[in-house]
Amino acid sequence: MSKELIVSKIENGTVIDHIPAGRALAVLRVLGITGKEGARVALVMNVESKKLGRKDIVKIEGRELTPEEVNIISAVAPTATINIIRNFEVVRKFNVTPPEVIRGRFKCKNPTCITNAPREPVEPTFYLVRREPPLFVCAYCGRYHELGDLV
């Protein structure tokens, strides 16, 4: 493996590292990043990792994630590490942790759940019932959702 950078360093922003291989697009989706926001986003998929074997990396220039955004990432990438970058240096580094409650970010996979009824203005709500690996339950129908279900 070459030691050269695949993607250049960012001056200020957030680097999301140790994303399980193939999950970077799901991370962008839960963060609501479509590419139309104007921020420069770099996405690297399936790079070698000592920790995971293979991993994805997302770099977001000029944006520091909020604590809510950081923790929502754990629903799709529980091994992710967040690096806050200022002046090309890592000023904070931490792991994601699953939130106790998720509201309005995901759809319940149960097609008969009240949250999926077109005329019912019910916000999907999920409660964390297990941290490792993350397991959530729908507050309305009781369906359990594992990693990857909430995308």
From Swiss-Prot:
UniProt keyword terms in alphabetical order: Metal-binding, Pyrimidine biosynthesis, Zinc
One Pfam family here: PyrI
One term under GO cellular component: aspartate carbamoyltransferase complex
Residues binding Zn(2+), per UniProt: 108, 113, 138, 141
Free-text comment on the cofactor: Binds 1 zinc ion per subunit.
Domain of life: Archaea
GO biological process assignments: 'de novo' pyrimidine nucleobase biosynthetic process; pyrimidine nucleotide biosynthetic process
GO terms, molecular function: metal ion binding
Cofactors required: Zn(2+)
Record's function text: Involved in allosteric regulation of aspartate carbamoyltransferase.
Protein family per UniProt: Belongs to the PyrI family.
HAMAP family noted in UniProt: Asp_carb_tr_reg (MF_00002)
Quaternary context: Contains catalytic and regulatory chains.
The protein, known as: Aspartate carbamoyltransferase regulatory chain
